[in-house]
Amino acid sequence: MKIKDHAVDTARAVAFLSRIPMPQSLFKTYDGRLGRLVRAFPFAGIVIGFVPALALLLLLGLRADPLMAALIALSIQVVVTGALHEDGLADTADGIGGGKSREQSLEIMKDSRIGTYGAIALILSFAIRAAALAAIARHSLPLTSVLAIPAVAALSRGAIAWHWQRLPPAKADGVAASNGQPDEGAMQFALASAGLVVALLIWPAFGLRPLVASLLASGIAALAFTAFIRRKLAGHTGDTLGATQQICEIAALCALATAL
C-alpha cells in the first residue's frame, strides 16, 4: 500500500471512529465499506488520543489532582469519539445481561435506551480507566504518563480488527454486516501496526515490563471476549466491536498501571 493511500485510509478511519471533521474530498470515491479501512484503525487511535492526552498534560502541568485530570481527559475523549465505543459497551452489556436467548439479546441491543446492565458497565468502565490512568500519572512524569492514552487508543482499536475478522456478522441486515468484513491481511496489518505503535510509545517511556503487560492483557481480553461473544451471539455486531475496544482499553491501562 502506498503511503498516500494509508494516509487517506487513516483520515477516513478517524472520521468513522470519531467526530473529528475530515475533508469531504476524501470520500468522493469511497464506497463506505470498512473492510480495508480497519488496517488504519490503530493510527486513527493515535489521532483520536491526541486531544485527551494534551488535556491531561496541561492539567498535570498545572498540578491538578491526577484522578480529576484523568476523569477530565476521559470526558474529552468521549466528546471526541461521540461515545461511539461506550455506546457499544452499554448496549452489549444490556443485551447479554438481559437476554435469555441469542435472539432476545440481539433485540435488546437494538434498543437505544440504556438499561441497568449498560449503566453499570459504563460506570465501571469510566471508574476503572480513570483510576488506572491516575495511577500511571502518579508514578510517572506528566510528559511520560500522557503517552499511555494514544498508545492504548491504538492498541484497543487494533483489537477491534481481530474481533471483527474472527466472527461472522450476528445479523445479516446489521450495520456491521453492511460495512463489510475485514480480510485476514487487513486484520494482521492492524494488529502489527498496533503492536508497533505501543512498542514505540510505551517501551521508551515506561520500560519493557509495562509494554509486555499491556500487550498481554489486551490480547487476552480480546481473545476471551471474542470467544464469549461467539458462544452467546454466534457473531459480531457494531455494539460488540465497541465493547471490544472498551474492554481492551481497560485491560491495557490496568496492566500498564500495575506493571509500573
Curated annotation (Swiss-Prot):
GO biological process terms on file: cobalamin biosynthetic process
MF terms in GO: adenosylcobinamide-GDP ribazoletransferase activity; cobalamin 5'-phosphate synthase activity
GO CC, any one term: plasma membrane
Regions that span the bilayer: 40-60, 64-84, 117-137, 141-161, 188-208, 209-229
A family per Pfam: CobS
Residues annotated as signal peptide: none
Enzyme nomenclature, EC number: 2.7.8.26
Cofactor: Mg(2+)
Domain of life, source organism: Bacteria
Keyword Transferase in record: yes
Keywords attached to this entry: Cell inner membrane, Cell membrane, Cobalamin biosynthesis, Magnesium, Membrane, Transferase, Transmembrane, Transmembrane helix
Enzyme class: transferase
Pathway(s) per entry: Cofactor biosynthesis; adenosylcobalamin biosynthesis; adenosylcobalamin from cob(II)yrinate a,c-diamide: step 7/7
Family: Belongs to the CobS family.
Functional note: Joins adenosylcobinamide-GDP and alpha-ribazole to generate adenosylcobalamin (Ado-cobalamin). Also synthesizes adenosylcobalamin 5'-phosphate from adenosylcobinamide-GDP and alpha-ribazole 5'-phosphate.
PANTHER family linked: ADENOSYLCOBINAMIDE-GDP RIBAZOLETRANSFERASE
Protein name in the entry: Adenosylcobinamide-GDP ribazoletransferase
